[in-house]
């Protein structure tokens, strides 16, 4: 009888421990990415040195916010790729309906079809399926200053670049929601090609998950200096698809810090890289890519 009582108490304790560590509901999303645009002119002459200064200033800001963890590691040059986004000039039906298409070549080579919306369930249930090889689909929370959306995307091997919406639907059957504009042509957004240089390395152990930091620089049409700089950190769900309360709380502190680094780093922005590119006024589209 005593043995049975002890075993029952032990089982109850283990169950309570499990509930305590996973008090939140399982998440729809695979990860959360927090991002902010910073002043690109700071990276014009020596990006590596500027990245180190940025990290030092960020750590100082976290200290003033009472962050109870630390950032370890340093930024080092990582993947370098050539990107292009595609939509229909003027009408921009993909962007207006929450979709985007991006090709990538270089250290990573693929094509991605993405749907973004503030409603988690709508984003989750929107079809973004692909028909290519090595498909990878994910649902991620994208957080920028003043905005939060759920991004549902599929990337796959890039075999061709779609020149019409109909061609896009063949690559990604999930794009059939755009069948009413299937004859529309697709061109590079803003008429430009982007060279993307990433710097990664810094991490912060925030509990059951790790925050991984990335600095991304965009160079337009082979320019020598970057036109865009983004600081971001990604937090993946734990092995059981949970984000614990301590992880979420510390993520919010990190988010507050990247949005208020100080020392002239932050610039007024609200939409992230893709929105920035759609608003970019190039020589090909001096009045803007979309009407």
Role assignments for model-derived ranges:
Residues 18-20:
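N-terminal signal peptide c-region/cleavage motif recognized by signal peptidases
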Residues 24-291:
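Phosphate-end processing signature that detects enzymes handling 5′-triphosphorylated RNA
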């Amino acid at each position: 009888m005593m043995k049975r009582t002890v075993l029952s108490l032990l089982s109850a304790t283990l169950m309570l421990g499990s509930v305590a560590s996973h008090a939140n509901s399982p998440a729809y999303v695979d990860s959360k990415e927090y991002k902010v645009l910073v002043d690109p002119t700071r990276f014009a002459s020596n990006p590596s040195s500027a990245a180190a200064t940025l990290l030092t200033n960020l750590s100082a800001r976290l200290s003033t916010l009472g962050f109870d963890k630390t950032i370890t590691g340093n930024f080092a040059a990582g993947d370098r790729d050539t990107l292009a986004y595609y939509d229909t000039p003027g009408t921009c039906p993909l962007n207006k309906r929450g979709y985007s298409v991006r090709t990538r070549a270089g250290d990573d080579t693929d094509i991605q079809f993405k749907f973004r919306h503030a409603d988690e369930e709508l984003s989750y249930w929107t079809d973004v399926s692909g028909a290519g090889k090595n498909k990878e689909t994910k649902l991620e929370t994208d957080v920028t200053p003043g905005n939060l959306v759920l991004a549902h995307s599929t990337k796959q091997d890039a075999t061709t670049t779609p020149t019409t919406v109909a061609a896009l639907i063949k690559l990604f059957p999930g794009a059939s929601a755009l069948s009413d504009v299937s004859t529309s042509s697709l061109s590079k957004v803003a008429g430009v090609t982007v060279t993307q240089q990433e710097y990664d390395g810094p991490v912060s152990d925030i509990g059951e998950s790790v925050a991984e930091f990335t600095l991304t620089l965009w160079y337009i049409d082979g320019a020598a200096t970057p036109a865009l700089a983004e600081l971001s950190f990604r937090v993946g769900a734990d092995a059981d698809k949970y984000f614990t309360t301590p992880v979420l709380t510390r993520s919010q502190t990190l988010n507050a810090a990247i949005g208020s680094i100080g020392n002239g780093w932050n610039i007024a922005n609200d939409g992230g890289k893709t929105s920035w590119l759609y608003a970019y006024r190039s020589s090909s589209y001096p009045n803007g890519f979309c009407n």
